[in-house]
Design a protein with these regions (language model features):
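Transmembrane alpha-helices and adjacent helix-loop boundaries
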Residues: 1-225
């Protein structure tokens, strides 16, 4: 099965898959997740503050995004919006969709973490003369983010794998590069396994970074206790 020609193909194709991973998949993940954190934090704080009107809009956003497939969302933005005169290039379209999609899931993670902060923490803040915004920014949000860190890290790992869907809107990331090589070599099994191992390597690195981050946060928490 794995003859010399196939091994040669795998060795030759490796940099052709890794380079799109480093230049497209990773940047797409980093940019999208960074934006999703901004969205998620804002949406979570709106819900936590119980701002009428805005809270309902936040819940509607989360309901729609979590209730529809990511691939459908990509198609709506890239293939659907041009019919109403809104044209978005593939890479920005992928960033937009991944940010909005991940933002909905991360918003629920952060909201739950905010609600897990003891009420006494806020009361103590009021007692020393802090304003509501100061309490949120200096007391509640830092504790909530520490609690949410493991789940948010898992969301990053999931997004790395989800970026493979961007090939459906012509983003030249790893999966599209794999498909192009398969079209010339007719070796789908070996090449899909190869790109799968690259995704696995990326995910493993992120898991190690997550573990290091959790240890550092736990150490910081013990020092602050």
């Amino acid at each position: 099965m794995f003859d010399s020609e196939l091994w040669s193909l795998l060795v030759d194709s490796f940099p052709k898959l890794l380079i799109p991973g480093l230049t497209m998949t990773i940047p797409l993940t980093v940019i999208s997740f960074s934006l999703s954190l901004v969205i998620a934090t804002a949406v979570a704080l709106v819900q936590f503050a119980n701002i009428k009107g805005l809270k309902q809009l936040a819940r509607l956003y989360i309901w729609i995004i979590r209730g529809t497939p990511l691939l459908v969302q990509l198609y709506v933005v890239f293939f659907g919006l041009p019919h109403v005169g809104i044209l978005i290039e593939p890479f920005p379209a992928a960033i937009l969709v991944f940010s909005i999609n991940s933002g909905a899931y991360c918003a629920e993670i952060i909201r739950a973490a905010l609600e897990a902060v003891p009420v006494g923490q806020m009361e103590a803040g009021y007692c020393v003369g802090m304003s509501y915004l100061q309490i949120i920014w200096r007391i509640v949000l830092p504790q909530a983010m520490r609690t949410a860190f493991p789940s948010l890290s898992n969301s990053v790992i999931s997004m790395v794998k989800d970026t493979s869907l961007a090939s459906n809107i012509t983003v030249a990331e790893m999966l599209m590069s794999t498909q192009r090589i398969i079209a010339r070599s007719y070796e789908p099994l070996a090449l899909y396994l190869e790109v799968g191992l690259i995704y696995l390597a990326f995910s493993t690195v992120l898991e190690k970074l997550q573990s290091m981050g959790e240890k550092k946060l736990n150490s910081y928490g013990h020092k602050g206790a």
